[in-house]
Each structure stands twice: as C-alpha cells, then as structure tokens.
Amino acid sequence: MTLLMCLLMSLLIFVRGCDSQFVDMSPASNTSECLESQVDAAAFSKLMWPYPIDPSKVDGIIYPLGRTYSNITLAYTGLFPLQGDLGSQYLYSVSHAVGHDGDPTKAYISNYSLLVNDFDNGFVVRIGAAANSTGTIVISPSVNTKIKKAYPAFILGSSLTNTSAGQPLYANYSLTIIPDGCGTVLHAFYCILKPRTVNRCPSGTGYVSYFIYETVHNDCQSTINRNASLNSFKSFFDLVNCTFFNSWDITADETKEWFGITQDTQGVHLYSSRKGDLYGGNMFRFATLPVYEGIKYYTVIPRSFRSKANKREAWAAFYVYKLHQLTYLLDFSVDGYIRRAIDCGHDDLSQLHCSYTSFEVDTGVYSVSSYEASATGTFIEQPNATECDFSPMLTGVAPQVYNFKRLVFSNCNYNLTKLLSLFAVDEFSCNGISPDSIARGCYSTLTVDYFAYPLSMKSYIRPGSAGNIPLYNYKQSFANPTCRVMASVLANVTITKPHAYGYISKCSRLTGANQDVETPLYINPGEYSICRDFSPGGFSEDGQVFKRTLTQFEGGGLLIGVGTRVPMTDNLQMSFIISVQYGTGTDSVCPMLDLGDSLTITNRLGKCVDYSLYGVTGRGVFQNCTAVGVKQQRFVYDSFDNLVGYYSDDGNYYCVRPCVSVPVSVIYDKSTNLHATLFGSVACEHVTTMMSQFSRLTQSNLRRRDSNIPLQTAVGCVIGLSNNSLVVSDCKLPLGQSLCAVPPVSTFRSYSASQFQLAVLNYTSPIVVTPINSSGFTAAIPTNFSFSVTQEYIETSIQKVTVDCKQYVCNGFTRCEKLLVEYGQFCSKINQALHGANLRQDESVYSLYSNIKTTSTQTLEYGLNGDFNLTLLQVPQIGGSSSSYRSAIEDLLFDKVTIADPGYMQGYDDCMKQGPQSARDLICAQYVSGYKVLPPLYDPNMEAAYTSSLLGSIAGAGWTAGLSSFAAIPFAQSMFYRLNGVGITQQVLSENQKLIANKFNQALGAMQTGFTTSNLAFSKVQDAVNANAQALSKLASELSNTFGAISSSISDILARLDTVEQDAQIDRLINGRLISLNAFVSQQLVRSETAARSAQLASDKVNECVKSQSKRNGFCGSGTHIVSFVVNAPNGFYFFHVGYVPTNYTNVTAAYGLCNNNNPPLCIAPIDGYFITNQTTTYSVDTEWYYTGSSFYKPEPITQANSRYVSSDVKFDKLENNLPPPLLENSTDVDFKDELEEFFKNVTSHGPNFAEISKINTTLLDLSDEMAMLQEVVKQLNDSYIDLKELGNYTYYNKWPWYVWLGFIAGLVALLLCVFFLLCCTGCGTSCLGKMKCKNCCDSYEEYDVEKIHVH
C-alpha cells in the first residue's frame, strides 16, 4: 500500500522520500580535491563575433508541434527569438599546460558559473557557427588553428543559494544537461546538487568555480570515455536523489546546428535541428523530460578541454537567444520544412508581409496596424509616502573612484529633485532611459554608486572610453537603465573632502618562474578592483607602487598596483551613477516628485494624457461633464470595466474617454523594396519614431523603425517620405487628397535615393484638340443667348477607412476576444473587404489618370510561334575504338588492373603473346612520336628476370672489371621506355584537359545564357500557374470556413453546445456589434463602388468637355458647350464648364427635307439645321423656304453649302467618325471577352467571400522569343562536343604462378573423390566397385510383400 501511494504521488510531484523512484548515479567522486582553475572573464569577453537572428535563414525556429505543412505560407504564433537579437555569446577554451608536450594543468575558464539568467519562455542555442574555419585560442590569442564545434552545458533550476563567499549555487532539484564522450553523448539528469566540501570544491576552501572538463589525450582516443565530463562534474557536486538520467548518442561532425529548451505543463522539452533538418534551422522535439517544477533560472556551465600544449585546438563560440511569444510568418516548402520566415513585429515592412500572409507583396499602400496617439501630459493624484534616505552619501569622507560606495533602495519614495539641488550639476546623461523618465518612474530597486571624481576627467568615465578608469577603477554597467551625474558639492553640504583625488593606473598579476609574465587585471561592470585594498582612502604620492603576494585562492602570483594622485579642487567634485531595475513587486521605489501642474487636469482637458490616480493608471482624455455615480467611490466604470469618470481632489467630476487611435498604413514599392509609414489623420507631434504600435491581425507590437524624420501631410503623418514640391500626372501610390508617393527610382527623383518623395497629383490640360461637329434636334430655335459658367464637382475617391474589428467589438477584453475566435475569420474578412475597397480606389484613380493622359493601347500577341526541335537537346553519341574483353571465367581466374591507354597497349599485348613474356618485354617496345614506350607495369616473371640481371651485374662487377655491368642495360632500357610511356600518357592527358577546359567554358557560357532565358520564360509560366493555383487553393479553403459557426463540422457543433451556452450573454453582444460593423462595411463598399463609377464619369468629361467641344446638350454644363476647365479637388475633380444658354426662342415650322414634283422626285436635306418657312409670309403654294442652323435662329437662302441631295424614300443616317460600325468587324481590338470584362469589373457581388476567384489569371503567354533563344543556346551546347584524342582503357591480366594452379587442381581432385565415396561407398548393400562388402554393418529386416498398384 505504501508503494502504491508513493507511485500515485510521484505522478503529481517528485516524492523525495521514495527511494525506489530514484536513479542510481554511483559511483560518487572520491577525489581528494577539485581541479584547479583560472577564471579570466576579461579574456573571454574580448573575443566577440556577433551572430544576430536572421529569420530569412530560419535561425532558431522550433517547428510547430504535432503537425506539418507543405507548400504553404501562414502566420504562426509561438515561441520564437527576436529578429536581429544578438543573444549572449559563450566561449570555451583549452586549459593550461606545462611545456611543449607536457600534460595539461589547471583549467582556463570564464565566470559563467557566476552568471544566473532568467529562463522565462526558454531559449535556443546556435552551435558551431564558426566550425571548420580558422580562429584563435582564447588562452593563446596569437595562435591560429582550426575551430571545432563545442556543445554547451547547462544547469536549470527554480531556486538559488550562495556559497560562503557569496557565489550563486542552485538549491533543491536542478536539471543538468552535459555533453560528454568528446561530443558524442548528451546527458540529462534531475538531481539535488550537493556541493562537495574538499579543497577547491563549492563548499571547500579555495573554491573559484565549478566546471566540466575532458582530458583529450586520454578520453578522446580510440576508446572514448562516455562519462568523462559527467565524472568531472561529480568532483564538484554529489548527485543526490536523482529522479531520472537520460543519454542520447550524437554523431560526431562539425556541422552547425541548433538546440532549444522550453517548458510547459507536460515537462521540459528538448529540441534539435539534427533530428530532421541537419542542414537547416528547423528544430524538432526529440525528448520531453519529467520536470514539472517551474524553471526560473539557468546557468551555462564552464567547460575546459585539457589538451597538451602542442595539440591545442580552438573551439567555436555558441550563442544563447531568449524565446518570446511572437507571431512569425512561415514559408513551408514542398518537403514540409520551413525555408523562410519573418518576425511580424520587427518593423513596418514585416507587419505588411504578415498582415497579408505573403513574402511577395506588390507595390501599393496597405493598412497594417493601429496606433494610439501619444500622451501629451501627465495627471497624477497619489497619497503621501516615506522618503528614501540619501543621507549616507552626504556625510563622512567621499570615497575614491576605485573604492566607490553603493546604496540600494527599495520600498520608499525618492526625491531626485531635492538630491540634485544640493549639487551644482555639470552633466546629467543617461543610457536606456531619459533623465526626465528616471525621475518619474517606479522601479523594483534603485542603486546609487558615488565617489569623488574630478570633472576634468569626466571624459574617461563616459561610455566607450578605454582609459585606466574603466579598466582598473570603475566600469559602469549598462545591463539596466542607468544615468551618470557629474556635479560639484555645494558649500552647505557636510561631506568631507579627501586630501586628493586618486585612481589606480595599473593593476597586474606577475607570474612565471622569474615573475616576468604580466597579466593586467581588468574589472567587470560594477566590480571592485583587487588592487583597491592597497590604499582605500587615497594615495600619498603620484605614481605610488604597491606589491602583494597573492594567495592560492586568489590565483597565485605577485600583485602589483600603481596609484595616481590628482590635486583636490576648491569644491569637492563627485560622480553619481544611478541604476534602476524594473519589476512588478509591491516593494517599489517611486519618485517623490515635484509634480507641478501634474496635480491638475484643467490645462489638459480634451487632450490625451497619462494618468495615475491613486494606483489606477492608464491613458485617456479628460472632460468636464455632469457628475454621475457615488462621489465617495471616486471612480465610475462602465459595464466593460472601463474607467469613464473620476471625482478629483479638486472637487470636480471628469469624464474619461480613451485616446484616439489612428490607422497605420505602409507605402511599399516592390522594385526598390522600400517602404514608408503613414499615420492617418494624426499630427506628427503625436507620433514618435518608436510608438506603441500594435497589429491585432498579426498580434505583434512593432519594435523597430529605420527612419526617424516625420513629414506632416494633408492625409496624416508620414515617416520615410521627403517633400520636394514635385507635381506628377501619373501615380501608382496615391495617398489621397491629391497626394502621391513617388519611389526613388522615378524620373522625378531630385533629392534622396533612399526615400519616397511626396508629390502633388495634378492634371495638365492638353494644348489643342480639334472639335468634332455634330448636329442637334429641337422644335424651338434660340434667338438670344447669355454666357454661363457651370461648376461641377465629381468625387473620384473616398477616404480610406480601416476598422480594428476586435477592438471595436470587444474593447480589449480577453474573454470576449476568445469568444470572437469562434466566429472564424469574420474580423479578417471585414479588414479584407475594406482593404479591397481601398485597392479599388487606387485602381480607379490610376485608371482615371491613365485614361485622361493617353488613349493608345498596345495589343497582345496570342499563342506560341515557331517549331522546336527537341532532338537538339539530346546528347550526341561519342564512339571509341572497339576493345576485346576476356570471358567471365577468365576475369574470375586472373588478377587484373586497368590503366590509361594512349594507343600502344594493344600492340604491346599482341607482341607479348607470341613468346615467353619475360624474354619479349624489350622486343615488344612500341613507338609513339619517335619514342620507344613500354607499359608502366611489371608482372612477377619480369620482376624476377630484371632483378636477377641487375643483381648479377652488380655481384660480378668486381670479378669482371666492370664488364658484367652490361647485364644491367636491359633493366635500364626497361625503365627508360616505361618512363617514356608515362610521359606520353601525361602529355595526351594534358592536351585533352586543355580541350575539355575550353569546351567546358564555352558550354558554361551557353548554359548560363540559356538558363537565364529559360528562367525568364518559365517565370511567366510559374506566375500564371501559381496565380491560378493560389486562387483555387483560396477558393477550396473557404469550404472549411465556419462563416460564424463554432465549427465546420456538425458533430463538433453538437458536442460543444454546452460550452457555448455559458457565454451566451457575451455572444449576444458580439452578434449585435458585428451586425452594426457589417452594415458599416457594406455602406463603405457601396460608396467605394460609387466613387469608382464617378471616376469613370470624370474621365469621360475630361475627354469630351476639356479636350474637345461637346455637342451633347447639358453634358458639359448648361446650354451649348464652349470650353471646360478642370482643377484638382479633395478626393476628386472640380470642373468649370463655360457655355451659352438660350434666353429667348422662336417657334418655327421645320422640315427634315424638301422634294420637288419630278418623277422620280429630287430631294434635298439640310446640313446641321432645318428647312423653315418664312415667318412673315402667309402659307400658300408660294411659301418660301429658308435654311437656319439648329443652335441659332438665322434664316438664309438654301444653297449647296447648307444642304445635300438625297434619294426619296431612303432614311439618311449620319455616322460620327468616332463610333465604330456596329457588328461589322473588330477593327478596334475590342472583342467579346473585353466587353464582358468591362461589364463585370463594375459589378460587385458579396456572397460568402468568393471574391478571390477574380484573381485567377487567364493571361495568354507569349514565349516564342524565349524559346527561339533556347534553340540557339542548345545548338551552342551541342557545338561544345569535345573531340578527345583516343585515350582508351587497357586491362592487364597477370597469370597465377604454377603452385597456385597445382593447388587449384589438387583441390578439384579431392572434391571429386569426396563426392565419389559419399555416393558410392556408403549405405547398406554397396560394394564399392565390388571390392568391399558391408553385410556386417547392415541390420536385417523382414521382407514384406507389397501389393502392386496399377495406375491407369
């Protein structure tokens, strides 16, 4: 029962008392002391190689868990590193060693064990970034060697303690991750780390730092010690009550990789890029460790490689990057890996890509996020608090710079104004915070370092200085916001002056046999120098030298210091370093400010201010209004828990409204990849270079902006735009209000090549256009006129509007936003619809200006032209000389070697077959280019013959007076001929190499041109195909859209109804507001379409009224049109139509034609007028007919000038020359498809968001030019055929010696005999050829009669 309870509890939390659940980590270390080490943090920090996070290279990305994607781009919210984050660099080094080939001694490490980092959301590690390159060794910077990859080691825990010397150690259970086995094993264990008490160990004397190490020449040889680092760690800590111990094997290589650690309720997760993406940055989870206690801190374990002095190697730095909850845009390849990424909150351009879920964005003006107006002041009402006590720094003797004093404050209110009033401030500079902010903010702690310091030396203490002050005396830390105050002490301050200013000008350690090796001892930020104890109060003389022998705990050697004395000034001059640390605790340090008019809101009514009202903080606009609510409660809230009213200490009641937020748009030009930022309808005085900008679509806050020069325009504040008074008539990036953004590559560029330019969009009238005559028809003809000017405004665009849907519906409440997620992509569709309306505006305005600027178009060419001979792509057949080959049996029975044959090997082989090979070698020599040549190979027979000849000539030389030396001539000739053969072969190879190089270069040039051309051609195909595929994919994805339901699956809806019911009230509110928002968007879409239609009308009026004289009555103003003028107006055009308007008319009797009585009759018709009767005569057969124009009554005789002959009974139609004959021929290049497009582009349908189908591209491709060029390139490739000189392969066979054949035959005979005896001489009844009987070895069996079976 006890065991059962123990197991049950272990599922919830590690039970410390269940011994059966612990892992045996024995053996424990039995070393009498820990290994000696030298901590030299300054040397390690000098070597810095920054590697910022680059999402485009997929740096540090953890692959989404439990799912995979293919060939898709999506925005994903998870744990990612910040783009551009430099991270923290860590470096390992080899240890000290004795002599050139001596064994290693003490370790050489940095102070990583003293650095405790916050774990937060976890981190990722870049490993081996510089592996395989050449670099320096930390311990010997002058030595360059190849860099190897080093794996990091970590301790992760939730609680800390300290050693007796104040150094941090991990308490309770800690997770330890250690690489081992010389980079082939990774250990992870969860234990209580109990410090050992022997010498140099954490609880012993002489402790400096814990670390792990491997002795390379012992642990990393043929047999790898898989526990070398683990055992070294055990020498510092006893591993107590370990709950698990896991190990993973690692393939040893020098490939760069990524490693990551996160934690959630399931435990600690480990990630690595080695699992599935070795040559990329994708990290996959490979282990989950049962660690459920929240990890708060981590420390990098120092590591030392104990190598001999002559075998030292450099080790690559690794980089740790913190993870944050961010939204990334991820691009998944076809094989499922992430190959591109964008940090959505990095800058405006990143938000643009993420807002539209695309890595490729076309040129345009896009809405990306919202921006809340910056506060213009502060309103504070708060209770009184206890003041921080600064009196210790105002009494006693002022300390020297190297012996500075420090005050740390918490849980009090400080009065910085009062403190600074006691000094004559000479300089007040800050880093990471402004002087005003540090005096007005609240912090978890406030630290003040102060010391006596002359103002004449203030340049030596500034950031970036490298003099003696920051090296040996005081180095300011910039880890937290900090300020530096340089001031003179006033006479009424009681602080005592020292005799003189003093500082350390040298602090070094002397080591070596003769103490001739000097190592400067630099200080780290916030640390004291080891030389400060020589003279804490100051130096008695300038250049005073001090020496002291260092203890073994201090690292040994001789400490030497030099002090410099500076004369004291009349008034004591001091330096104050104020550092603050932000936090969320209740023991905060807040300012006791001289609030001035911050206590009153009367001068800031109607403005956006930051307020702090008795602990309630926020940002809003205060207004006087009628009091509501209970006065004693001070605060009045609405049903959304928003502060809407406040009873102030001044007795007034103020309404509180939220500050105005404005839309943010990005102006983007694809050709230059430049962008600018537009803050709609806001003054630049409210916009800073890094404001609180938040995109609810990408859930990202902006962190960076490149440009910091705002420009005020009529449409809002723009950053990244310069004003050069440009006027353009064509605009691809309209901003509204007749403003345009011109990219820097434009012909209008005159100022900056790195910014957009602001231009005014203006219409310039053409010079002269000949009017087109036309006729009109009326029953009354004017007799008098007056001039009239008709003014007309046509709206061609509307103000672009974006709505933050989530903010409008939920007003920032998390519970509401979670329910709103159940409505699918409703909000995103709202934003898409509004963005579509904005794009429609841009298109209509661009079309308008293009139409009134030019009327010429260029026709498209359709189809593919030309024939393509694909056989040109075939590789030509290259033939060679025929070669004879031995049979398969011969290949089996002979040893062989294949060598290059320049052409003489076959003749040599045929000659050798005619007699004994050992005697015919020289006889069979071949001639090539006048040289005798032999193959560069000997068989055993020739080796024996030539060796015997050579030895015989040498041995007999003494007996024959050297005459026997002639026997060595065959050997010499053989060597000469064979060397000739080698030379001839090399010469042929060299010539062929030149031919190959020349032809290959020619082929490369042709291929380069060909691939470039094919890339241009196929990119057109890809654009067309991808555009259709993306549109169809978008259309198919709509099938899974919930369209406001909680799920697209009916079963899910039925299963989850009970969970929705509890949020019914909030759901009703969401429904009501979404309906209101939907109605607004619908109205906006109608207005947008109306403006687009009006833009077409404006285009027609420019072409007909401004460029020409219109004969249409009333189209270009009132009356008969004379001339029109047009000027720009907000969101449209303003027309001035000049015409004459009839004031009096006369009624006349008119006829459309006159005919006589001839047979056939002869008829005439008026030209641009009427035939009328004379009004002064009486109607009779003698009635006189006259002609008058249709626009002005002026009778005149009928002549050939104002009439024409026509045939009777035939209708006369006058066709204007600007109208094509209908249905005759398509002479205007406008076909039925174009007419449909002209119709449908002005028709908008809002069904279930199938608008994306309009983006399907049906463009016909014209690839004939590109394919023709490819034909020529392929011909050039075939021309690069390399006609090599014949250099075949020759296979030389070497027969086996006689004893091999003899053994081979004997084996065959033995095999045959074995078979014979097994088959013929075994078994009962055999006689072995009648020579042997075996009756005695056979048992007797009864014989049975067996019935015969007949098979028919």
UniProtKB/Swiss-Prot annotation:
InterPro entries: bCoV_S1_N, BETA_CORONA_SPIKE, CoV_S1_C, S2_sf_CoV, Spike_N_sf, Spike_S1_N_MERS-CoV-like, Spike_S1_RBD_bCoV, Spike_S1_RBD_HKU4-like. A motif (KxHxx) lies at residues 1350-1352. It is found in: Virion membrane; Host endoplasmic reticulum-Golgi intermediate compartment membrane; Host cell membrane. Residues 993-1043 are annotated as: Heptad repeat 1. Residues 13-1297 are extracellular. The chain crosses the membrane at residues 1298-1318. PROSITE patterns: BCOV_S1_CTD, BCOV_S1_NTD, COV_S2_HR1, COV_S2_HR2. Glycans are attached at residues 30, 71, 111, 132, 162, 172, 227, 241, 384, 415, 492, 624, 723, 762, 773, 784, 869, 1144, 1147, 1174, 1226, 1242, 1257, 1278, 1289. Residues 1319-1352 are cytoplasmic. Residues 1022-1066, 1259-1287 form a coiled coil. Residues 887-908 are annotated as: Fusion peptide 1. Residues 386-592 form the BetaCoV S1-CTD domain. Pfam families: bCoV_S1_N (PF16451), bCoV_S1_RBD (PF09408), CoV_S1_C (PF19209), CoV_S2 (PF01601), CoV_S2_C (PF19214). SUPFAM superfamilies: Coronavirus S2 glycoprotein, SARS receptor-binding domain-like. Specific enzymatic cleavages in vivo yield mature proteins. The precursor is processed into S1 and S2 by host cell furin or another cellular protease to yield the mature S1 and S2 proteins. Additionally, a second cleavage leads to the release of a fusion peptide after viral attachment to host cell receptor. Residues 21-356 form the BetaCoV S1-NTD domain. Keywords: Coiled coil, Disulfide bond, Fusion of virus membrane with host endosomal membrane, Fusion of virus membrane with host membrane, Glycoprotein, Host cell membrane, Host membrane, Host-virus interaction, Lipoprotein, Membrane, Palmitate, Signal, Transmembrane, Transmembrane helix, Viral attachment to host cell, Viral envelope protein, Viral penetration into host cytoplasm, Virion, Virulence, Virus entry into host cell. Residues 906-928 are annotated as: Fusion peptide 2. One of its GO terms (cellular component) is viral envelope. It is a single-pass type I membrane protein. Residues 1247-1286 are annotated as: Heptad repeat 2. Its main location: virion. Disulfide bonds join 191-242, 344-354, 388-412, 430-483, 442-590, 911-924. Belongs to the betacoronaviruses spike protein family. Homotrimer; each monomer consists of a S1 and a S2 subunit. The resulting peplomers protrude from the virus surface as spikes. This is Spike glycoprotein. The gene is S.
